[in-house]
Amino acid sequence: MQNRSFYVKSYGCQMNVYDSQKITSILESKGLKNKLDPKSADLVIFNTCNIREKAAHKLYSDIGRVNKLGLKKTIAVVGCVAQAENSEMFRKNKSIDIVLGPQSYHLLPKMLDDLENNFKQINTDFIVNEKFDYLSEQMRPQGVSSMVTIQEGCDKFCSFCVVPYTRGPEYSRPIKSISDEVKLLSQKGAKEIVFLGQNVNAYNDKSNNNDAKLSDLIRAISEFDSVKRIRYTTSHPINMDEKLIQEHKII
């Protein structure tokens, strides 16, 4: 995989931006070079969003633009459109080589290796707990304000929303995993931490006999002297409990 290069295009929400940053860190740790232009990259990754109805149409248009460059590229579609359309993507556009759901992007290096056997690669399993184990020490600094995913998925199944089908059921990262990431980010200059989740205030870490809610996580992260501000998005009113409200006054 050495001497290869990649380009990542992100669509949609802040969590996709965060996921693209993690994909970039993982690939760079494997020796790939990040490019700012698809023309100069061997691998083009589209990290997709499926909230809006025309999201897939925009994706296929962008793939068409890459194909018009006339250069052989490995094309990977990751994220929520990949999860929603699954193997159907290969039928719709034969230039797609990899289809990867939003809970499996840590498998991308292995899929690239397997692709050398000339088999198209797909993984849309909901294995969200595994991907957070791949916290690269070479994580790229995000700047003064840094995003950290603490929760994914949703159990609400609102009639207008596709999130439970593309991001899966609610899952909360262990506090230790989040703390380790915040520590790395703070060492790289982060002063503000933005917690991300599809239903962020449904956060509930039950690992290792814990029962930690978002209020407990905020309290734990506030102990980092270098972290001056904590924000979170997106919240749901049904999970806005009194303890969390009081934490806004205390911290």
State the predicted function of each range.
Residues 1-203, 213, 243:
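Proteins enriched for Cys/Gly/acidic motifs involved in redox and nucleic-acid/cofactor modification
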Residues 54-62, 205-251:
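Conserved AdoMet/S-adenosylmethionine-binding subsite of the radical SAM
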